[in-house]
Amino acid sequence: TAAAMGGLVPAASAAGIKDLWSMDLQILATSDTHGKFDPWDYAANKADASGSVAQQATAIKENRTKTTLVVDAGDTIQANSAELFLNDDVHPMIAAQNAIGYDVYVTGNHEYNYGMATLEKVLSQQKAKVLTGNVYSPEGKPLADGYTIINKGGVKIGVIGMVTPNITRWDAKNLEGWTVTNPVDESRKIIDKIKNDVDVIIGVMHMDVDNEYGVYGSGVTDL
């Protein structure tokens, strides 16, 4: 599943702005790294420079400023032998992201491949703010918050994080007892809740641009 990230709404109306000013807010977004710590395909035993944590770290270091928001939209711990490290104290992919210093991390659909206990363990290792506001435990507890507010250069940024509802199709057994709600509906509730408290709202969504399987809310265009 592809990940989509985009600005949703400016939170303040022009009429409510007393002093106009501008700044450059840069958003660096990564996703679908799929266990690639280095630019190397371990299964094929050959170089693969299509994207890796090492390359991301370099790009982020070269471009980061005081007004840069760095986010990742998941599919991090699956493929390229990454599953071999799920029982480590800190998964090497997570350790690398911690070293880079991400602001926000959102789960991808492949994070659910190994069961919820494993996922919760891995998420506890993240230093970034973990967001996934549409997955709930059997007790009704959210897997993670649905949003966070981050200040960059005096700008209050509301960041919403959701995962595709189709994880119940692909990992139904792993999600037994858990509830996955519609990410579009959840996002709209959050927008109404925080729109007067932030300057801008962005969404970090691990889902396609258009709907998959005709499922409403599985594409960001519904938002």
Language-model features: where?
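N-terminal export signals
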Residues: 1-13
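Acidic, metal/ion-coordinating pockets
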Residues: 14-223
